Curated annotation (Swiss-Prot):
Protein's job: Polycomb group (PcG) protein. Plays a central role in vernalization by maintaining repressed the homeotic gene FLC, a floral repressor, after a cold treatment. PcG proteins act by forming multiprotein complexes, which are required to maintain the transcriptionally repressive state of homeotic genes throughout development. PcG proteins are not required to initiate repression, but to maintain it during later stages of development. They probably act via the methylation of histones, rendering chromatin heritably changed in its expressibility. Associates constitutively along the whole FLC locus.
Organism: Arabidopsis thaliana (Mouse-ear cress)
GO molecular function: DNA-binding transcription factor activity; zinc ion binding
Domain of life: Eukaryota
Zn finger spans (C2H2-type): 86-111
A GO cellular-component term linked to this record: nucleus
Residue ranges, annotated region (VEFS-box): 267-345
Protein name: Polycomb group protein VERNALIZATION 2
Residue span of region Disordered: 398-440
Assembly mode: Probable component of a PcG complex. In plants, PcG complexes are probably composed of a member of the EZ family (CLF or MEA), FIE, and a member of the VEFS family (FIS2, VRN2 or EMF2). Component of the plant homeodomain / polycomb repressive complex 2 (PHD-PRC2) large complex during prolonged cold, composed of core PRC2 components (VRN2, EZA1, FIE and MSI1), and three related PHD finger proteins (VIL1, VIL2 and VIN3) that mediates histone H3 trimethylation on 'Lys-27' (H3K27me3). Binds to ALP1.
Gene: VRN2
Keyword match Nucleus: yes
Expression (tissue specificity): Weakly expressed. Expressed both during, and in the absence of vernalization.
Keywords: Metal-binding, Nucleus, Repressor, Transcription, Transcription regulation, Zinc, Zinc-finger
Similarity remark: Belongs to the VEFS (VRN2-EMF2-FIS2-SU(Z)12) family.
Amino acid sequence: MCRQNCRAKSSPEEVISTDENLLIYCKPVRLYNIFHLRSLGNPSFLPRCLNYKIGAKRKRKSRSTGMVVFNYKDCNNTLQRTEVREDCSCPFCSMLCGSFKGLQFHLNSSHDLFEFEFKLLEEYQTVNVSVKLNSFIFEEEGSDDDKFEPFSLCSKPRKRRQRGGRNNTRRLKVCFLPLDSPSLANGTENGIALLNDGNRGLGYPEATELAGQFEMTSNIPPAIAHSSLDAGAKVILTTEAVVPATKTRKLSAERSEARSHLLLQKRQFYHSHRVQPMALEQVMSDRDSEDEVDDDVADFEDRQMLDDFVDVNKDEKQFMHLWNSFVRKQRVIADGHISWACEVFSRFYEKELHCYSSLFWCWRLFLIKLWNHGLVDSATINNCNTILENCRNTSVTNNNNNSVDHPSDSNTNNNNIVDHPNDIKNKNNVDNKDNNSRDK
């Protein structure tokens, strides 16, 4: 649009005096029109004067300086592949080096597995790339440095010196338990306790295993606990004592269980949902309190949640609470359980729904919503209404039966109304006296 307007405003004088107009400052669009009018007679004038041609020339010149040709050669110095990279970028890691000299420093320092030959030509730069064959020779063959030479180290395991000489054996602090159990008491003869289960000879496998653990020799007999009835009897202990491993494990397990039992008795545990104190039997049982559901606490939380609703009246909150508690107790989870739950809910709360009409209408609206969502069908709604109608009919018949009097009760009332004959005579005498007084 600007070019057309300027072209329309231009006059023949401007076409003639283009050289003079170039010397005067003018707008770029007008200057471009002057160039265009002048290029009609000289077509080569416009490409030489436009700025984009000048910029293209600069760009071409910069490309020529930044263009690098990589010639990849094999071991026999045979050309295998040629690649052209611009902006002096590395062909291996694509790093911009900025200049050919920077590219030379980068290739020699970062890619030392290749051998590079750099050549500068008038039009472009060339880099001949070949593989260093010496880089694949292992360092073990030509390593003159002593730091890289392998060496061997041989060390003997150190023996731990014992206090008091080499031949001293380790001593164990053995505690003998009192012979309270009947099985141990039966094995005592002449005040010497012969523990057949615990202390065995070295011929048994358990004894030999323990002897190997405690560095026992065949010359040292096992320790035997002597218990005598005399008060002056002494307990003789040898250098080693054989204690069965199974017995010690059982004793340690029993002690740990007793200790944990005492710790559980000292602490007070509470239920996770009800926050009520737990008895020791409940703590030691396998049942987890996390899985339990307290109905009272759940009802209380449900009522608190419903009380926060503002746009719901009291009757609707009562119905919602009844339905929520029923669904929770009966574990109604899937959509297929809704039909059964509606019928059972109608039977369970038929008296409440019959006595309170507001709850009854809330129940009907709830059934309609379930039907809209496709959770119940018309047969389920019919069954629920039939249950409530039967409840209403039974209540009406009971009321009618209570209002009708029994025949025996009416006869008793009539008998009570009949007067005695003496009472009738007294009434007649009173009437006659009244009449005589009136005549006088």
